[in-house]
């Protein structure tokens, strides 16, 4: 488990392509002089409780990015979305709906106030009307095939998560 490792142990890990992990501060520093957006997913439940969001806001404030529109918080947790609304009300907050929620929450009731709603590719294809629901932008994950990227583009998806950014750029140019 990652939570049981020291930073030194984590830093030595190869996370792919010879890359090592970064501290959040290092990632924020890399973002400073770019036009890139950063989507930060908070994982819950965590052994850290509310400290996770508090520390994230502290680090973003320290980096001068607390009100930067390029920073987006994404989470499957309504609690995390509510915490971020209280701690950083101007920050973009994307609630990620789980696929099983389509069975137990048919009216799509929100227990928090996200600024955008996330949905999986599977759910979006099963329920295309969910794209743009409640008048909010839609974040779609994880879209790696060009035909799915084109489908998302044609159906009004606002943000797309992919493991294939080069493919995405080519797919939307066509």
List the predicted regions and their residue ranges:
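C-terminal active-site rim and adjoining tail of enzyme catalytic domains
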Residues: 19, 94-174
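Metal-dependent phosphodiesterase/phospholipase catalytic core, i.e.
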Residues: 1-92, 112, 119-122, 132-134
């Amino acid at each position: 488990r990652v939570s049981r490792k020291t930073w030194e142990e984590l830093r030595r890990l190869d996370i792919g392509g010879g890359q090592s992990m970064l501290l959040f501060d290092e990632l924020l520093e890399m973002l400073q002089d770019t036009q890139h957006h950063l989507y930060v997913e908070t994982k819950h439940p965590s052994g850290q409780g509310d400290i996770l969001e508090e520390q994230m806001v502290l680090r973003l404030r320290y980096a001068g990015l607390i009100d930067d529109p390029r920073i987006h918080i994404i989470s499957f947790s309504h609690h995390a979305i509510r915490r971020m609304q209280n701690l950083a009300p101007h920050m973009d907050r994307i609630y990620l709906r789980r696929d099983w929620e389509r069975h137990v929450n048919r009216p799509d009731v929100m227990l928090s106030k996200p600024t955008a709603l996330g949905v999986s590719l599977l759910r979006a294809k099963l329920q295309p009307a969910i794209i743009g629901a409640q008048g909010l932008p839609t974040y779609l994950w994880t879209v790696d095939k060009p035909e799915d990227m084109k489908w998302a583009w044609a159906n009004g998806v606002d943000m797309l998560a992919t493991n294939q950014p080069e493919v995405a750029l080519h797919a939307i140019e066509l």
